[in-house]
């Protein structure tokens, strides 16, 4: 099948490239035609992503009907004296006059707000016409900051803007830097691996092209099917596509280079390359897609969108890797690798005893001491995995770029006002007879709950009362969520007048409900994803023991990754816990990508067994020949995720996935899996056949690489 596909591609490469360009142009044009700048198909409201039966969701629905929020977004101004002294009456008068001085484009209103109990700072709120992450809002925040500086110049007052719109404005520049850094890392690593500027630049261009196709397709899908993309999906999608797309290109280009070195012409070399890697890469992509697709079983809406979106994107990327990439590189031939010389590094060598490089050294170690390698690898990964015993989840999603104005202003606010000022908990009281008197009496009872630092106001409209409460703890902290579930909700329901109903909502209550749902999701998604991956492995490898072994290996890799993350962020970094999404995201990435790389190594190992090698020889040869391509792909993918460490909201996910990919690459694919295969031998592939059809006695010296080889014999460059 892949030979037929490759032959068709290299015969008409221009048509293949034109078809992809046509698809890109059509989807991009359609996306712009339906694009809604207000971001109605993008949301970060977690209440939108929970099942309807949860109390926080019901509270949000009641609030949106009875007390609809104005369109757009908001930013909060924090004003204080430069000398830290309490605000004077003259200072207060200047702040009262700010609304007239801050009427800039994109801002609908500015309203003076609360004064801190110690009188040292005061708030003001600006309403913006656009959504927080819209370009017009980012520009409006910039104008607000300039106007504020002008208005307070020489007054002895200093101010900073924070809140959702200001945080988005500060994060937008960092996002550009992160994505630019990611592309730079990939460019540099491709240059190191292939020593070809053409490959580095062209590969990045092709991957970005396919990424645009995927993004446009998902955007159009949102318009047709009504799903919404949150910031996690939008942040992860380009990272995944850049990393995985580069992976597939590396596998193709390694094999293509080997055949060009062997003397094949550019078309024959590409047909050979695609026919040999096509099956393994396709199955690997299916494993990744199935792992991501398992998120459909989650009851959290953001995961239900994230998983299928990534699955579709990965399948598009593998389609490009088998059509678009071969078409482009078959046209270039040897010129793609310029200025590197395509000389076979193994030419004239009759044995691999003198082979150098990490892969060759690892191969010799596995051939001589497979049991030692297996035990040592399991021990190291097991020790790292012990960190999972101390894992705690964190729901603190309000991380702002360190050193930014929004982060500094938030620190000022928290020093003088309750921690929950920017994210009040909202309690709704509904039913006949609900009036202001009943609502205020109800609010007084709620204010006695220990977690409540201060009431935030009472409103009554159409038989619905809204009571805002400012919590004493940070709204996304575990203490706040525990208190809302264990103290505030029971008290609110008990204090409700007869015949009325109570709904506790707000961000803290929403994340308390998410915590409950997520715990149940983890117990469902983990085993289902593992089972589906195991089934795919069994169908592809046709070996029971090897399939079970690969699953066990990637599970150990996941535990080691999560344990390392606990060590880095909780123990060394002093953070309260790991992002609540991290275990599920890391499990899927490490399991899928770890399996992906292992498939390539195991496929090569099985071919070496069929060529007549002993299990130890086959394991060593698989590492020596497949190891460099896997290492190059793993390092590039880890590098692309590692850049996310610069993002305050994605740092944990970025580092964890990068560590997990490196563990999967070197700990599993280079060491543990080949060592276990060397120990178990041909029995690992039962009931599939692995013996040479000719019945030849296994050779003690090296044999020519079989034609079915997955990746070339290279040393890491």
Features from the language model and the residues they span:
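Membrane-embedded transmembrane helical bundles of large multi-pass transporters/channels
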Residues: 1-41, 108, 132-392, 499, ...
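Structured non-transmembrane domains adjacent to transmembrane bundles in polytopic membrane proteins
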Residues: 43, 52-74, 82-162, 390-577, ...
């Amino acid at each position: 099948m892949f030979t037929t596909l490759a032959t068709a591609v290299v015969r008409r490469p221009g048509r293949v490239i034109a078809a992809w360009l046509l698809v890109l142009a059509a989807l991009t044009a359609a996306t712009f035609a339906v694009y809604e700048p207000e971001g109605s198909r993008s949301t970060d409201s977690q209440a939108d992503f929970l099942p309807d039966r949860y109390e926080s969701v019901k509270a949000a629905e009641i609030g949106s009907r009875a007390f609809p929020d104005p369109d757009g977004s908001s930013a909060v101004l924090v004003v204080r004296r430069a000398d830290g002294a309490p605000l004077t009456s003259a200072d207060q008068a200047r702040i009262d006059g700010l609304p007239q001085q801050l009427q800039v484009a994109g801002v609908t209103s500015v309203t003076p707000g609360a004064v801190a109990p110690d009188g040292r700072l005061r708030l003001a709120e600006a309403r913006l016409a656009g959504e927080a992450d819209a370009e017009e809002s980012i520009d409006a925040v910039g104008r607000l900051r300039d106007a504020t500086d002008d208005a307070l110049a020489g007054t002895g007052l200093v101010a900073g803007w924070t809140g959702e719109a200001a945080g988005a404005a500060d994060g937008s520049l960092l996002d550009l830097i992160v994505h630019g850094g990611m592309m730079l890392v990939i460019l540099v690593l491709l240059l190191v691996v292939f020593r070809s500027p053409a490959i580095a630049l062209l590969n990045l261009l092709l991957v970005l092209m396919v990424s645009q196709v995927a993004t446009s397709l998902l955007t159009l899908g949102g318009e047709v099917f009504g799903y919404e993309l949150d910031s996690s999906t939008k942040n992860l999608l380009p990272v995944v596509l850049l990393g995985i797309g580069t992976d597939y290109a590396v596998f193709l280009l390694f094999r293509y280079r080997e055949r060009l070195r062997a003397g094949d012409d550019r078309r024959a070399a590409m047909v050979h390359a695609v026919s040999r890697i096509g099956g393994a890469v396709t199955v690997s992509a299916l494993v990744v897609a199935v792992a991501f697709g398992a998120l459909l079983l989650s009851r959290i809406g953001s995961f239900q969108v994230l998983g299928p979106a990534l699955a579709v994107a990965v399948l598009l990327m593998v389609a490009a890797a088998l059509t678009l990439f071969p078409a482009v590189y078959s046209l270039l031939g040897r010129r793609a690798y310029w200025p590197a010389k395509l000389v076979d590094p193994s030419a004239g060598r009759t044995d691999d005893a003198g082979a150098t490089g990490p892969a060759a050294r690892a191969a010799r170690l596995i051939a001589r001491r497979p049991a030692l390698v297996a035990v040592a690898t399991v021990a190291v990964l097991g020790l790292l995995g012990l960190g999972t015993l101390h894992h705690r989840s964190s729901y603190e999603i309000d991380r702002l770029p360190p050193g930014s104005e929004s982060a500094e202003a938030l620190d000022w606010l928290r020093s003088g006002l309750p921690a929950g000022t920017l994210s009040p908990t909202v309690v709704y009281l509904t039913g006949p007879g609900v009036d202001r008197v009943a609502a205020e009496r109800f609010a007084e009872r709620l204010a006695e709950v220990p977690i409540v630092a201060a009431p935030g106001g009472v409103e009554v409209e159409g038989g619905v009362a809204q009571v805002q409460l400012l919590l004493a703890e940070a709204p996304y902290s575990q203490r706040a969520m525990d208190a809302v579930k264990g103290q505030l909700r029971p008290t609110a329901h008990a204090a409700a007048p007869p015949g009325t109903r109570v709904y506790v909502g707000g961000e803290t209550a929403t994340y308390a409900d998410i915590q409950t749902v997520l715990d149940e999701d983890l117990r469902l998604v983990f085993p289902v994803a593992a089972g589906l991956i195991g089934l795919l492995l069994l169908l592809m490898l046709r070996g029971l023991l090897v399939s079970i072994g690969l699953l066990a290996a990637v599970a150990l890799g996941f535990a080691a990754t999560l344990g390392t993350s606990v060590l880095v962020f909780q123990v060394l970094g002093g953070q309260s816990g790991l992002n609540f999404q991290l275990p599920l995201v890391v499990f899927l990435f490490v399991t899928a990508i770890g399996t992906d790389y292992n498939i390539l190594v195991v496929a090569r190992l099985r071919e070496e067994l069929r060529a007549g090698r002993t299990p130890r020889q086959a394991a060593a040869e698989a590492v020596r020949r497949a190891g460099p391509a896997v290492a190059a792909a793993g390092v590039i993918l880890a590098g692309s995720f590692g850049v996310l460490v610069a993002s305050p909201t994605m740092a944990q996910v970025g580092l964890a996935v990068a560590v997990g990919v490196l563990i999967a690459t070197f700990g599993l694919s280079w060491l543990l899996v080949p060592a276990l295969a060397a120990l178990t031998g041909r029995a690992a592939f039962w009931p599939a056949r692995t013996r040479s059809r000719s019945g030849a006695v296994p050779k003690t010296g090296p044999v020519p690489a079989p034609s079915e080889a997955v990746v070339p014999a290279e040393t890491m460059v």
